[in-house]
């Protein structure tokens, strides 16, 4: 036999849940969003509150192990992690640039969704832009390797992947080494493009790596 819930039963249950504090329809998470489709974003670190263990987006994160990346108490800043590029031999139409922190392409896909991502742009010294020209088909992997600056150091990075129309490419992002590292990935993908991105996080056990990602099609 099947039980049928009436509308008034559902409403009564919802009212009861509110009474006991199960949820509050007007409660927002630390990003200021009521739903995942309404996430607050900003490049300004001061627009975000410091995450707490009871915040919904952070309650499963051991904040003490983030070494201050979430609240600004991280160890002294150092230069961005060195980046090396491995592009298949004979490939044309693929460009890797080191750019200043104010390069618009680093922000083209949107703003960070949390305080750590915004801290990247507050502390960023330079970034990396990978551009794949229109109609370029890459045979093999484009690999970018980011190497930590060392134990008890902190660095920040930003990567923009700009894929033109009707491109085909596989991009591998590899992270290795020691240190605290926060970065932001901006993906701007053109019409008809097919781009696969694989992330290999092979940093040492004493390292901390946090990343924000935004995609624009």
Which residues does each predicted region cover?
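Glycine-rich and polybasic anion-binding loops at the starts of cofactor/ligand-binding domains
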Residues: 1-217
């Amino acid at each position: 036999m099947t039980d049928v819930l009436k509308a008034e039963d559902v409403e009564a249950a919802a009212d009861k849940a509110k009474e006991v504090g199960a949820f509050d329809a007007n409660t927002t998470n630390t990003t200021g969003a009521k739903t995942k489709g309404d996430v607050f974003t900003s490049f300004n670190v001061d627009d975000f509150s410091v995450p707490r263990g009871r915040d919904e987006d952070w309650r499963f994160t051991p904040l003490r192990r983030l070494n201050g990346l979430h609240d600004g108490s991280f160890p002294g800043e150092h230069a961005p992690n060195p980046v090396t590029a491995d592009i298949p031999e004979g490939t044309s139409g693929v460009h890797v640039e080191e750019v200043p922190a104010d390069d618009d392409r680093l922000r083209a896909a949107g703003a960070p969704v949390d305080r750590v991502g915004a801290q990247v742009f507050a502390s960023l010294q330079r970034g990396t832009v990978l551009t794949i020209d229109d109609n370029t088909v890459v045979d093999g992997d484009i690999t970018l390797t980011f190497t930590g600056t060392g134990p008890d150091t902190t660095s920040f990075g930003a990567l923009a992947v700009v894929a033109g129309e009707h491109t085909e490419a596989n991009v591998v992002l590899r992270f290795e080494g020691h240190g605290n590292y926060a970065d932001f990935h901006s993906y701007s993908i053109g019409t008809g493009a097919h781009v696969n991105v694989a992330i290999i996080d092979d940093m040492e056990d004493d390292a901390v790596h946090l990343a924000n990602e935004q995609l624009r099609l």
